[in-house]
């Protein structure tokens, strides 16, 4: 098992703790700054491969991304969760390849 000891789990634990859930979180200012700058990419093609059953990035987040990138090419995999490439790999890989061509 990859997470059989604290030494193997600590990085994941720190990553989760760094997700800003409150405006007072130390990462929130940086995340907001990045979000404010996303509009600079609106003239570029954007493709999203989205899991319809994602427990973390739900439909509310997808709507936000669609508002930022109205021309975004969205592939919604209704049965996929957070790990789209594991749940809908063949289809997602095809869609990503199409976007890159």
Protein language model regions, located:
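Conserved serine/cysteine hydrolase catalytic core
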Residues: 5-67, 76
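Catalytic active-site module of serine/aspartate enzymes centered on a nucleophile-bearing elbow/loop
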Residues: 70-101
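The alpha/beta-hydrolase serine catalytic core
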Residues: 1-2
């Amino acid at each position: 098992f990859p997470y059989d000891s604290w030494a193997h789990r600590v990085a994941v634990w720190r990553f989760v703790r760094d997700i800003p859930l409150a405006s007072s979180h130390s990462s929130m200012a940086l995340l907001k700054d990045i979000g404010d700058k996303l509009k600079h990419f609106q003239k570029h093609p954007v493709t999203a491969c989205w899991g319809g059953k994602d427990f973390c990035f739900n439909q509310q987040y997808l709507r936000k991304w669609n508002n930022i990138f109205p021309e975004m090419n969205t592939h919604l995999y209704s049965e996929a969760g957070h790990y789209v490439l594991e749940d809908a790999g063949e289809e997602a890989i095809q869609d990503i390849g199409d976007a890159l061509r």
